[in-house]
Regions:
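Short beta-strand-plus-loop segments that form exposed binding edges in beta-rich domains
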Residues: 168-177
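Extracellular glycan-recognition surfaces and repeat-rich motifs
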Residues: 27-52
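Extracellular ligand-binding interfaces
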Residues: 55-154, 162, 179-184
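Active-site-adjacent substrate/metal-binding segments within catalytic domains
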Residues: 214-377, 393-424, 495, 499, ...
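Polysaccharide-binding and catalytic clefts of secreted carbohydrate-active enzymes
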Residues: 281, 291-292, 299, 305-345, ...
């Protein structure tokens, strides 16, 4: 594949709509849509094709909008079905996006797919709506993320009755996905689930069977009787025997024939020939390849108020009584009930053993984050431990590292992991603290810290640092172009300052925040588990250099 530089992507969009979609054509009139180019050139041809040329710059796109400031109502459908052919000599990744005018910037519907040269595929662009819209449209399906023949709920869903933009673009990954090439969108039509799946248009109640499955449909893998458990158990045992797992692996899943390192009895990291590796407790190089959430917790669903959804629920006084639970309403755990049906009274022990067998057979070697600690006790597969704790927050997804309880609460939670989740085990690869923190950037936290209350520990630290840097408030005001009467005035102010006003100081604070966070977390881990790894925080969104510099320390 050629290197990408100043290249162009040509997309030929054939707007071929079947006569069966006449209603959709009226709502979604492509020929009369307004064409907008962004770092691109596009035009309609006489044969109803739309030829688009995108340059390789990030963000290049062509959009279609309804004329006369109208919008398209697609609420009768569940998605778009798009037939695409790659007619270029390179791998490409078309991206189709829908937007609504009343949505936030981060709310949109999109989907994409890989296409090898000359390959044809059909892309399904599923429609997602917000929880509020779902509750209004489908009151018969309570507390669900989607029902039979409904759109699905997603946190960034949009109002599909009010679509004002359809965009065509491409995803560019250097040396893997080319931005140079052509593809044809051969056919576009809206669809409903009952048109493409084995779904009835009108769904009667109940719609969930005794095994927790969708009742009104046939599909591969569906359980039809108790005998299916016996049959599938034998099938899996035969498969595990035929595929015991990869050869040339240590008992930890490390690389037996690789360059041997020092055996320390615990996992550690080492840079070898310029590349960082895990090293297993016996000194073999280790590449962690795992899956999160290994265990037997799954389909624990609310029953109270929704009894009519379910067919043949067992009695609360039957042998399935342990799979009922209370709290915020009565619930039933179909996953555990089915494991009981399959493995009998020792289902927990058998399930844990089987999970280790499965991962090894599939070529995996790690019980990753949020896996069930009961599986760790068997000491057969390396695992990671997720650490969550209470703390005062600086932002919704960012703890305040200057909070007096920040470090102590992490330490206490680590001690709980030591007591209850086999934290001291040599099979413990390490600890993740927090999940997907929103680091954003200095400009975002400039607004957050300037608007924080006077008792926010991070703001107190920042103002103290400012007082040490600037001899007088007049000197600070001169630099920031502000009119604070004192440093205490900064502390009590809830005014959101512009990043440009105090860019240097805000950037310094951001770096200090990252340093403080990662240093405190690592110190907490090492204070309880001196021989185990701190694996970091897991990052959300774009990663900037300042956060990476702090994390790598």
């Amino acid at each position: 594949m050629n290197k990408l530089s100043n290249v162009y992507l040509t997309i030929i969009v054939a707007l071929v709509l079947l006569t069966s979609t006449k209603a959709f054509t009226n709502e979604f009139d492509w020929q009369s849509a307004k064409l907008h180019n962004y770092k691109a050139n596009a035009k309609f041809s006489e044969n109803e094709q739309l030829t688009i040329t995108l340059n390789s710059s990030k963000g290049a796109a062509v959009t279609l909008r309804p004329r006369n400031d109208k919008t398209w109502d697609l609420s009768a459908y569940h998605g778009l079905k798009v037939s695409i052919k790659n007619i270029s000599n390179a791998r490409i990744m078309p991206l189709i996006t829908l937007d609504a005018p009343n949505s936030e910037k981060w709310q949109e519907i999109d989907n994409s797919l890989y296409l090898e040269p000359q390959q044809s595929k059909t892309l399904l662009v599923y429609f997602y709506i917000t929880a509020k819209d779902f509750a209004q449209r489908y009151p018969q399906y309570q507390k669900m993320n989607g029902g039979p023949n409904t759109q699905m709920i997603k946190w960034d869903g949009i109002d599909i009755s009010n679509i004002n933009k359809l965009s065509f673009s491409a995803i560019n990954v250097r040396d893997y996905i080319s931005a140079q090439g052509s593809y044809i969108v051969q056919h576009i039509e809206p669809f409903r689930y009952d048109q493409i799946f084995d779904n009835k248009k009108e769904i009667p109640f109940p719609f969930i069977d005794k095994y927790g499955q969708y009742l009104h449909g046939k599909y591969p893998g569906k359980l039809n009787s108790e005998h299916d458990f016996i049959e599938r158990e034998q099938q899996e045992l035969d498969d595990l025997k035929a595929h015991p797992g990869p050869d040339n692996r240590s008992k930890w899943g490390g690389w037996l024939s690789g360059p041997k390192q020092k055996a320390t009895g615990n996992f550690y990291t080492k840079q070898i020939d310029g590349k960082w590796w895990f090293v297993d407790p016996d000194g073999h190089l280790f590449w962690s390849h795992g899956v999160t959430g290994v265990g037997y917790h799954g389909a624990n669903t609310l029953i109270a108020g929704r009894e009519h959804y379910f067919q043949d629920l067992p009695s609360k006084h039957s042998k399935y009584q342990d799979f009922y639970s209370k709290g915020r309403g009565t619930r039933f755990d179909f996953t555990k009930a089915n494991l009981y049906r399959k493995f009998g009274k020792n289902w927990q022990e058998t399930t844990n053993k089987r999970n280790h067998q499965r991962l090894k057979s599939w070529g995996l070697n790690t019980f990753a984050n949020w896996s069930d600690p009961s599986g760790f006790a068997l000491q057969q597969t390396p695992f990671t431990i997720a650490v969550h704790y209470k703390s005062r927050m600086l932002e919704e997804k960012m703890p305040d590292p200057w909070d007096k309880d920040f470090g102590p609460n992490i330490t206490e939670e680590l001690k709980n992991k030591q007591r209850h989740e086999h934290g001291d085990s040599p099979w413990n690869l390490g600890f993740f603290i927090n999940n997907e923190l929103h680091w954003m950037g200095p400009s975002s936290y400039a607004t957050i810290i300037s608007n924080a209350p006077a008792d926010q520990p991070a703001k107190i630290y920042f103002v103290d640092a400012l007082q040490k840097k600037y001899k007088t408030i007049a000197e600070l005001n001169d630099t920031w172009q502000t009119k604070f009467s004192s440093f205490n005035d900064i502390l009590s102010s809830r005014k959101k300052l512009k990043f440009s006003q105090f860019k240097e100081d805000a950037t310094w604070f951001y770096q200090q925040m990252a340093n403080k966070y990662y240093k405190t977390c690592r110190q907490a881990v090492k204070s309880v588990f001196p021989n185990h790894l701190y694996l970091g925080s897991r990052l959300h969104g774009d990663v900037n250099a300042m956060v990476l510099r702090a994390a790598e320390k």
